[in-house]
Curated annotation (Swiss-Prot):
It catalyses: heme b + (2E,6E)-farnesyl diphosphate + H2O = Fe(II)-heme o + diphosphate. Its EC number is 2.5.1.141. Converts heme B (protoheme IX) to heme O by substitution of the vinyl group on carbon 2 of heme B porphyrin ring with a hydroxyethyl farnesyl side group. It comes from Paracoccus denitrificans (strain Pd 1222). InterPro entries: Protohaem_IX_farnesylTrfase, UbiA_prenyltransferase, UbiA_prenylTrfase_CS, UbiA_sf. It is found in: Cell inner membrane. Pfam families: UbiA. The gene is ctaB. This is Protoheme IX farnesyltransferase. GO terms for cellular component: plasma membrane. Carbon 2 of the heme B porphyrin ring is defined according to the Fischer nomenclature. Pathway: Porphyrin-containing compound metabolism; heme O biosynthesis; heme O from protoheme: step 1/1. The lineage of its organism: Bacteria, Pseudomonadati, Pseudomonadota, Alphaproteobacteria, Rhodobacterales. Signal peptide: none annotated. It is a multi-pass membrane protein. GO terms for molecular function: protoheme IX farnesyltransferase activity.
Amino acid sequence: MADINAYEGPAEAGFGDYVALLKPRVMSLVVFTAFVGLWIAPQPVNPFVAFCAVLFIALGGGASGALNMWYDADIDAVMRRTAGRPVPSGRVTSQEALAVGIALSGLSVMMLGLAANWFAAGFLAFTIFFYAVVYTIWLKRSTPQNIVIGGAAGAFPPMIGWACATGGIGIESLLMFALIFFWTPPHFWALALFMKDDYSKAGVPMLTVTHGRKVTRCHIFAYTLVLAPFALWLGFTSVGGPLYLAVSVVLNALFIAGGWQILRRSEDQAQADGYRVEKRYFRLSLYYTFLHFLALLVQHWVGGW
C-alpha cells in the first residue's frame, strides 16, 4: 500500500463529503437487504426496534466504507471511477476517514446489541472486520479471487437482519446470503471488462488483469449458472411464493442470457461497440439483486405458498 498519510488535503470538507465517505450507494443495498431479511423473518419485530436495527446496520456498513476509503486512498487516486472520492481528492484526510470508520464501527455494534440482540451485533462486527481487513487489506491486492471471497461481506446484511429478528440463522437467510454471494463476481467482473485499464494501472489483480478478458467472460457465465438454483430455491422456502418465483425465473433467464452473450463476444467486437453488451449486463446486474429482494418483501405482504 502507498503512503496513506500522503492524502491529507485541506480542511475543506463539507457534510456531503463525510456522507460520501460512508459509500451511500453501496450502503443503500446493505440497508435494503438487511431490512428485508429482518422484516420477512418468522418472528415479528416492533417497528421502532426494526428501524433502530436497520439504522445501526447501515452505520456499520458506512463504517466499512470509511475504513475502505482510508486504506484504498492510494489506488482510488489513480482510478477514474474513484479519483473524486473524499480522501484521494483531498477533501477528507486519511486520519479523519480512519477515525470515522473506527468510531462508527464501535457505535453501530454496541447499539445493535442493545436494540436487537448480541448475536446480531457480533455478526455485524464480524462483517465489518471481514470487509475492512480480510477483503480491503488482504484479498483486494493479493488475488484475482478478491471479490469472490470478499463478496461475502456484502452478502451478510440480510443474515444480520434475520438474526435481529430471530437471534439465529435459518435456511432462508443462508439462501439470501448465497444469492448475493454468487451474484457479486459476475457483477464486478462485468465492470472489470470495460474498466480493465483502470484496475491494471492501480495494481489491483482483478481477473481481467491477471487472466485476461476471455477467461473472465467464461467465469461470468459460469457464475450465472451457479447463481440461478440458489435464487430459485429461495422461492420454495417459507419466505418464497409464486410471485417471488415468477420474478426470479424472469431475472435469472435474463441474467443467464446476458452471460451467454458476454461469453460469445470476441474482444474485437467489444472494443468496436465500446463494450455496449458488457455495460448493459452490468446495469442489469444492478437491478437483479434489488428486484429479488423487493419480490421477497412483496411476497411477504401478499402471503406465500
